[in-house]
Structure formats: structure tokens, C-alpha cells
Amino acid sequence: MNTEPLQPLEAEVETVSASDFRFDGGAATYWGTGLLATIITVFTFGLGYPFALVLLERWKAKHTYIEGRKLKFNASAWGLIGRWILWVLLTIITFGIYSFWVQPRIMRWKIEHLEFDATSTADNPAPAEGRSDVPAFRFDGGAATYWGTGLLAFLVTIFTLGLAFPFALVLKLRWKAKHTYIEGRQVSFDGTGFGLFGNWLKWMFLTLITVGIYSFWIQPRLIKWSVEHQSLS
């Protein structure tokens, strides 16, 4: 007779292989951080946006693991604010034309200021050897393909009255993954619109029957889904 103790189901579900991307952020800390970021942005008339952005990116990195290693966002708002003011001025003097370059540059700044958290060595394996000459995180996406993909995603969402949002989101996530490299390895995204569609309908239904309360859980779950459908090639 087998006398080994039964293992809890939860432990089985939480087991993550070293090759996985994992995200463990929850709704409470997400909305707490988001509220603070919104207050900073609103009360500074947008000038404090870099500080708000850093708050959100630090929260996301703190809850993200790649191949067992925890991420860390190493940028400061002061490192972005000069560029942010410059981009705003260039957008004004070009009558909005320069704005097409702002979002891809912010995305690049966010990705290239990520690193693996060296203080978590007790839980995280050491970085792979032989890659010290390769930037840990690199992004090479440009404005043309960013806005082309964004326009297609927008049209897909609008012409389906929002029902095809999961397919639009997947378009954008695949584009981002295609242009992101970690220690020289390209990120791949294997999520599909159909794979998210069922969850999306369920979340909308739960939001409806809870009179909007469930909506607080949707964004963190979208982030988790987006992160955990990535891998390194």
C-alpha cells in the first residue's frame, strides 16, 4: 500500500519550468500603483508622466520571471524626463507628426532598461554563461511597423464593435515579441486570438453580472496572459 502523502493540487498548478515566462502580480497592487501613477500624471498636467511610467514598469518587472530569474526595472524618471520634454516639444513644433515616433521610443526605453535581479540569487539561477558581451534586453522595432500593426489592430477592434479585441491584442504582442531580444535570443509569442477569446467573453460576462466590480481583475489577468505566452527561441 502506498503511504506517501498526497501533494496539494495548488503546488502542482504553481510548478513552473525554468523555460517559462511567469507573472504573479495581483489586482490590488496593480490598481494601487496605477492610481498613484494617474494622480502624479494628472496633478502635474502630464509633466510627471515619466515618474508614473517608472512606477508601473517597476511593479510589472517585480512580478515577472524569465527562466526562473526575476526581472528588475533599472531606470529612473529623471533619466526619461529630459527626453520626454524634448519629444513633447518636437510633437508641438511638427504639428503632431513627431508623435508617431514617441510610442516606439518609449517602448524601447522600457525594454532596454530591464535587467535580471541579481539580489534574488537564492531563488533564481545564474545568467547563462558566454553572453556577457550581449546586451541583456534589446528592442529594434520602428515607427512604421508599429503604427501599421496598431492601425490594423484598431480597425479589427472597431469594425467588430470590440468583439475581436483579443485578435487585435495578439497582433500587437506578436509584433513586440518579434522585435525583442533577451541575451541575444529572440522572444516568441505563442498566444492566439482564439485562445484569449473565451477568457475575454467570460471576463466581460463577469464584469456585467458584478456591475463592473470584476473589471478590476481584467487588466492584471491580461498582463499575466500576455507574459506567460512568451518564450525564448
Feature map (PLM): residue ranges:
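Membrane-interface extramembranous regions at the lipid-water interface
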Residues: 2-36, 52-85, 102-152, 168-201, ...
